[in-house]
Amino acid sequence: TKCYKTGDRIISEACPPGQDLCYMKTWCDVFCGTRGRVIELGCTATCPTVKPHEQITCCSTDNCDPHHKMLQ
C-alpha cells in the first residue's frame, strides 16, 4: 500500500511491511481558531483508537488518505 505521509512536506510513500492501512488523524491545538485542525497522515497496521477531540479515518487503497485542502 502507498499512503500520503506528513512531515516536512506531504509525500506519497510505500508503507512498511505489515502496515497495509492509510490513516488521516485530525485534532485541534492552540492555533485551531486561526489555522484549522492539525492533520497527520501515514501508514498503520490497525486503525488507531480515537481519543477525545480527535477524528481518525482509515482506508486500504493506495493514496486513499488525502485531505481536500492538501490537494489544492
Curated annotation (Swiss-Prot):
Upper classification of the organism: Eukaryota, Metazoa, Chordata, Craniata, Vertebrata
Organism annotation: Ophiophagus hannah
Tissue: Expressed by the venom gland.
Annotated localization: Secreted
Alphabetized UniProt keyword annotations: Acetylcholine receptor inhibiting toxin, Disulfide bond, Ion channel impairing toxin, Neurotoxin, Postsynaptic neurotoxin, Secreted, Toxin
InterPro entries hit by this protein: Snake_3FTx, Snake_toxin-like_sf, Snake_toxin_con_site, Toxin_cobra-type
Purpose of the protein: Binds with high affinity to muscular (alpha-1/CHRNA1) and neuronal (alpha-7/CHRNA7) nicotinic acetylcholine receptor (nAChR) and inhibits acetylcholine from binding to the receptor, thereby impairing neuromuscular and neuronal transmission.
GO cellular component terms listed in the entry, alphabetical order: extracellular region
Transmembrane regions: none
Keyword Disulfide bond: yes
GO MF term list: acetylcholine receptor inhibitor activity; ion channel regulator activity; toxin activity
S-S pairs: 3-22, 15-43, 28-32, 47-58, 59-64
Protein name per Swiss-Prot or TrEMBL: Long neurotoxin OH-5
Family from the record: Belongs to the three-finger toxin family. Long-chain subfamily. Type II alpha-neurotoxin sub-subfamily.
Predominant place of localization: secreted
Alphabetical list of Gene3D superfamilies matching this protein: CD59 (2.10.60.10)
